[in-house]
C-alpha cells in the first residue's frame, strides 16, 4: 500500500503558494485494509476515508467511466490493481494531475509524479486537459473557469477550449444540477480576478447557458459620460473585480454581479440611456436566484442593491426625508449590517468604471451618518406616548428620524 498527495497541493507547492487543501490517493489497498488502520469510511459513490488523527480525506485509487449525461452519470472501479497513473488520468487538468509519495510520518518523499506534463504547463501558464475523458464531466468547464479566476495569468490551451465548446454544443452543461453550478460560481466569485471566470465561460458559450442574464449584458451600450467603458458587460466585470480587490464578501460580489441585469432589456430606441433598469433588474434577478438556488443572504442583498443602487448614488442630492425613506425601503434600520454591504456594492459600482477606479464616493459616509442618526431615535418612547394609535406612531417615528437625519448631515428636512 502506498499513499500519495495529489492534485492542488502539489500544484500550489510548485507555484510557491500556500497549500489550501490536501487530497490523498491510496494505491494497492482495499477498504478492509483501510478500516484495519482505523480509517473511517465516508464516501457514498466510491471509497473515501478520513484519517484517524488528522481527519483528512484519503481515497482509494479508482477509474471511472461515463454512463449517462450530466454530473452524476459515472461508474467507478476501485481495486488494489488500479495504478496511480490510472487514477491521475481521470483528472481534469494536467496541472492537477501530479502526485508525490507520502512517507509513514507524513512527509512528501521522492520526485513529483507527472505523467501528463503538468509541470511544463505550469511554466507555460496553461490550462490543458489530461485526456479525452475531460468531456465526460461538464463540471470541468466550471472548474477551468474558476481556476482562471484564481490564476488570472493562465490561458486555456486551444485544444482544451475546443473541447469545452464541443461540450457546450452537445448540451452537457444543461444537465448540471443548480447546486453545483452555484457552488462553482460562488467559489469563482471569491477568487482574486472573478472576471476571468466569466470570460472563460463566455468564450466557450457556457455563460449563455448557465447565466444568460449576464451574457446578455455584453454589447449593451451605456452613456459614455457616465461609463467611459461603454459596454455594460465590461462595466459589470470591472465592478466584480473591484469588489474582489477590496476583499468583500460573497454576498457583496454577487450583488455587484447582478445589479445591472435590467440594462439587457432596455428598449433599443432609448439606448444608451437605461431609465427604469433597476426595476427590470429585480424582475430578472428573482427567477435567476430561484433557478440557481442562491442562498437567502446573497439573494436578499442583491435585490436591495439592484433596486436601490441608483438612489444610493444620488444621495448627495437628497433632503433628510428622502434619505430616511431610502433607509426604510432598504430595511437599513432593522438590518444595518446588510445595508453596510449594500454600500460596499454601490461603491464598487461607482468605481467599476474606466478611469474612475479611485474616485471618491462620499455617498457612503453620508448614508452611514444618516443611518446612525435615524437609529438613535427612540421609537419605543414615541410609541408609549401614542399608545393605541399605530398610524400616528409610524408617522411620528418617521418625522423624528427625518429631524435627526437633517441635523446630523446638515440638510433640509
UniProtKB/Swiss-Prot annotation:
Keywords noted in UniProt: ATP-binding, Hydrolase, Magnesium, Metal-binding, Multifunctional enzyme, Nickel, Nucleotide-binding, Nucleotidyltransferase, RNA repair, RNA-binding, Transferase, tRNA processing
Function: Catalyzes the addition and repair of the essential 3'-terminal CCA sequence in tRNAs without using a nucleic acid template. Adds these three nucleotides in the order of C, C, and A to the tRNA nucleotide-73, using CTP and ATP as substrates and producing inorganic pyrophosphate. tRNA 3'-terminal CCA addition is required both for tRNA processing and repair. Also involved in tRNA surveillance by mediating tandem CCA addition to generate a CCACCA at the 3' terminus of unstable tRNAs. While stable tRNAs receive only 3'-terminal CCA, unstable tRNAs are marked with CCACCA and rapidly degraded.
Residues that hold CTP according to the record: 8, 11, 91, 143, 146
Sequence positions that bind ATP: 8, 11, 91, 143, 146
PANTHER family (alphabetical): MULTIFUNCTIONAL CCA PROTEIN
Gene Ontology BP term (one): RNA repair
Record-annotated HD domain positions: 232-333
EC number(s) per entry: 2.7.7.72, 3.1.3.-, 3.1.4.-
Catalytic activity reported: a tRNA precursor + 2 CTP + ATP = a tRNA with a 3' CCA end + 3 diphosphate; a tRNA with a 3' CCA end + 2 CTP + ATP = a tRNA with a 3' CCACCA end + 3 diphosphate
Record keyword RNA-binding present: yes
Residues engaged in binding Mg(2+): 21, 23
Subunit details: Monomer. Can also form homodimers and oligomers.
Source domain of life: Bacteria
NCBIfam families found in the cross-reference section: PRK10885.1 (NF008137)
Name the UniProt record assigns to this protein: Multifunctional CCA protein
Cofactor note: Magnesium is required for nucleotidyltransferase activity. Nickel for phosphatase activity.
Further remark: A single active site specifically recognizes both ATP and CTP and is responsible for their addition.
HAMAP family found in the cross-reference section: CCA_bact_type1 (MF_01261), CCA_bact_type2 (MF_01262)
Domain notes: Comprises two domains: an N-terminal domain containing the nucleotidyltransferase activity and a C-terminal HD domain associated with both phosphodiesterase and phosphatase activities.
